[in-house]
């Protein structure tokens, strides 16, 4: 697979929607993830990321402007032991509960499908990072409508064993802006992952569309020790 420039990919797409990046730092020592949210409506833009336990959740920046919390207030990141779960919706909780009951990542998502926000039918994108005894692997999933037809849910899971240093995968909800919004197509995209969390955070923050970006979360986890460093950038503050 050809590696793409994450900077160019984001700068040339005004509305990829919500996006997940998972990979490994170039020096091989850190498991890396990033999650961003964007918005076109006042309701979607009226959000911030806040820390909750070892993860984060979305919260209304101005509670008086919150019109419909159903698909925009959720926990995008939760940690279960040596697993970090990152998703674009409340399926974070579904995966957490499934893994806790010894189901696999894929099995946990069997009870879920794309979001019921027709005509967009926003895909549910998810990722899980697994660190154990100095080994690091991850998986990503997308649940989407069949080319906009809600009668059929397409389920794709991508597993990456022994993640390669300096490389990651990027998946997002929408192929591009549109009406209705077209779902992401194809495999998660191969991108570079730098060693420095500040550099990676700045790359993402500066590449996302200025009007539509809302919040960004970046985490670097030390594969040897499990300790982590987190950056949260909210447009509203």
Q: Over which residues does each language-model region extend?
A:
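Conserved short alpha-helical segments that host acidic/polar catalytic motifs at enzyme active sites
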Residues: 1-237
